[in-house]
């Protein structure tokens, strides 16, 4: 008699939950590819818009296709007045990820995906609208300013920085943001992406799938590591102080965010890319203290625990050097990862079976209901 082999692993670690053509993570311990392209190659030689097109279509665009795609995205940047009115009602103290979740859901009420033939339109609409959703709420709730949600910036990264700061970004800042969006765009079956695929497997609409993914990313065990890293780094006065205080954190068994990874075993290939940009921005700003402290943290964690930095750690100093408020770090992740989420929704729909796993019951043995007086 054959016995069914049961896979083990908390949180489904090490278990395959499906097939994808979109991304490989952790092959040989540290690899990352989007549709066959290495992440370092994409970060060096492409733009975020090209990567979004790649994930949605399976191939990089030629010049004509890219120009058409960017023009389509450009035309979708503004927000409906009804959505602006809702964003103005959201208090300053609200978690920014709740703002992104509400903005996504409400936009789906105003501009629904009526059938799956509109999936690319819905995905591109969210891609274009997310920077404005984030910045319109932030500028109004924190500064009382109703911003223009459009800009003449050519890239989505530049557009975001323009909305946030009220002026055109430098060429270097625009490129750094572009690279950051590329690095965060897709990462296989992480928790939020799998949430989107589960939702898609029920044949739900794009806005519902993305709203669910945002809610999942809101959890501190998935999103927010770059924010937590920034909060920690800001408490250190020097590299030596960082190492001393981190030793105390380890002794107290406190969790230190921004290190290690669930899939990568040797290194996170995104780290070396964003770390180099952090160093460039430090030199540009004429203040390398934040970068030097970050390097000290990296050295300490490797020497002490053999834990490497993941993509989030040096993103903290990178965003800080560009003047981005810490509370917006994870919403930026949403602006980027939307491409991966939407691509996975589209892929799930192409060969769909509802995702419905089983569970191993570990509860009480069968029993009878006793009269209430005898319980």
What does each model-identified segment do?
Residues 1-375:
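Non-transmembrane, aqueous-exposed alpha-helical and coiled segments at domain scale
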């Amino acid at each position: 008699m054959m016995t069914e082999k049961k896979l083990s692993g908390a949180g489904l670690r090490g278990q395959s939950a499906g097939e994808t053509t979109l991304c490989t993570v952790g092959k040989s311990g540290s690899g990352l590819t989007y549709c066959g392209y290495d992440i370092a190659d994409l970060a060096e030689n492409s733009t975020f818009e090209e990567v979004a097109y790649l994930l949605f279509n399976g191939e990089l665009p030629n010049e004509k296709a890219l120009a058409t795609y960017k023009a389509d995205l450009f035309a979708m940047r503004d927000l409906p007045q009804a959505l602006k009115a809702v964003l103005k009602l959201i208090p300053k103290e609200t978690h920014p990820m709740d703002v992104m979740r509400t903005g996504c859901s409400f936009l789906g009420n105003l501009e629904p995906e009526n059938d799956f033939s509109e999936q690319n339109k819905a995905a591109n609409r969210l891609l274009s609208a997310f920077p404005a959703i984030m910045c319109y709420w932030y500028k109004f709730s924190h500064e009382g300013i109703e911003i223009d949600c459009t800009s003449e910036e050519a890239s989505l990264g530049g557009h975001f920085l323009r909305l946030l700061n009220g002026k055109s970004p430098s060429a270097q800042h625009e490129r750094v943001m572009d690279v950051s969006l590329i690095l965060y765009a897709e990462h296989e079956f992480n928790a939020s992406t799998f949430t989107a695929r589960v939702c898609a497997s029920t044949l739900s609409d794009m806005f519902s799938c993305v709203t669910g993914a945002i809610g999942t990313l809101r959890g501190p065990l998935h999103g927010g590591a770059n924010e937590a890293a920034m909060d920690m780094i800001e408490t250190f006065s020097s590299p030596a102080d960082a190492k001393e205080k981190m030793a105390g954190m380890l002794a107290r068994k406190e969790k230190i965010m921004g290190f290690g990874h669930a899939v990568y075993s040797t290194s996170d290939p995104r780290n070396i890319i964003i770390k180099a940009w952090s160093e460039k921005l430090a030199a540009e700003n004429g203040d390398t203290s934040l970068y030097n402290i970050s390097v000290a943290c990296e050295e300490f964690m490797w020497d002490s625990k053999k834990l490497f930095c993941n993509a989030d750690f040096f993103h903290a100093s990178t965003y800080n050097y560009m003047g981005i408020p810490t509370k917006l770090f994870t919403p930026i992740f949403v602006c980027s990862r939307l491409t991966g989420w939407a691509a996975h929704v589209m892929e799930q729909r192409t060969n769909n079976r509802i995702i419905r796993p089983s569970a191993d019951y570990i509860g009480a043995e069968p029993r009878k209901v006793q009269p209430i007086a005898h319980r």
